[in-house]
Amino acid sequence: MIAINTDKPVSIGTAAEASNTTVKMLRYWETKVYITPERVYSGSRGYRFYYPADLQKITKIKDYIDQGYTLQAAVRMANDDK
């Protein structure tokens, strides 16, 4: 896991690296509406941006999964931690 010392949004690749997840995992969680990154479009290309609060939630979800919880339970617990 890398440290992010900024209030600026980061790309999906940086978010995945910072939270010890994968880009594929974050995209899947987004399809399930467990996370909702900011989406910015430039022409036909779309970009996802994650803010520090998003990274905290992603990290909590991943930590709960690593402890043996299901994805749904991990999301519920991460949401309750707010």
Protein language model annotation of sequence segments:
Residues T22-M25:
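Short coil turns linking two alpha-helices in DNA-binding domains
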